[in-house]
Amino acid sequence: MNGNKIYLCIDLKSFYASVECVERGWDPLTARLVVADPERSEKTICLAVSPALKQMGVPNRCRVFQIPKEIPYKMAPPRMQLYIDYAAEIYGVYLKYIAKEDIQVYSIDEAFLDVTDYLHLYQMTAVELGRKIMQDILDTTKIPAACGVGTNLYLAKVALDIMAKHETDRIAYLDEARYRERLWKHKPLTDFWRVGRGTVERLSNMGICTMEEIAHARESLLYKAFGIDAELLIDHAWGREPVTIADIKAYRPKNTSFSSGQVLPRDYEYEEGVLVVKEMADLLCLDLVDQGLVTSHISLTIGYSNQKCFEPAKGSTTLRSATSSNRRLLSYVEQLYRRIVRPGAYIRRITLTYTGVMTEDYQQFDLFSDPEETEKDVKAQRAAISIKQRYGRNAILKGMNLEESATTIERNGQIGGHKSGV
């Protein structure tokens, strides 16, 4: 167990929408604003909805057309770089109180803070320290925050997600006893961290609808239904979580992969899809070279247009030897694409993944690859990386990037698939 640990989980309320309100001089808690790209169709997803709209029943991740027509609101195009700048400034606020070793950033708008060793220093309770940090964030950036306080990471997160939003000061505390008292009978289970609809459906089929019922269920039945994941489910039902921030920071995954995915702006024909996949492969190659890595396995998933009910095309290929050469990898990717994709079907979604990634020190050459050609490829890629880092991602382009159906130039101006605003 965690002994006497105490954590804060701080969330920036409707972060993207709040930033846009602050930039316009509006109160983030009262303004009606959604963050969505007006250049896309009404089916585009709202990246954020301001708290005032949420109170009127507008869900956070709705599509634009789902917002009731009778509700007036302003739309702000996403500016991802601006949000990153605000998040960095708020991280600086955390560092005024807590060392970076005790901070775990969960997402751009949420972070866990291990405040165990700081309460005596500041002569405060965890709730008091949480309030102080929230106020500092508000004073520094005008962004409102909420805070969960808990005796482990799970309880801090649940206190934030389920309880803090009902408190006038947007802060709530949970320990194991309080959790069982307040939330054991809470419904729906999807309100709890890491409990998805599929899990709830399987639990419901077993006659289980609350955390209390999970806690008292026969463990053998839970393990039969959920396998090793039952251990996490049982721990969380009792309000237990043994993992600490130090454990998270010390964790190193056994396997590394590089992935790129995009939803195309329209239905793409077969040959147009080849172009986009090769662009994606080329950019992933640069990522490999930049980090001194090579890959030995490629996976590709193609989602077709909704015009026809085709199942997604999925395939993979293993390379004869690991490489980061764009010439070799683009050839493999194109062969894989032509092997799995229907020539007459329209394409809408593409996901490309390089797996079996290792450091280039382990690279071996086979009888069919030319070491000198590969080294020449990698040197050219390193030069391209250097130019892009100095002059911008569109400073050096290939002929294929200039074709009408290409997406690289536009995507280079995005962060996370959305406009950077720069």
Predicted feature descriptions by range:
Residues 9, 201-346:
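DNA-contacting surface of Y-family translesion DNA polymerases
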Residues 19, 315, 319-422:
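Acidic, metal-coordinating catalytic segment for phosphate/diphosphate chemistry
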Residues 113-134, 163, 207:
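Catalytic palm subdomain of template-directed nucleic-acid polymerases
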Residues 1-108, 112, 237:
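Residues that scaffold, gate, or flank divalent-cation-dependent active/transport sites
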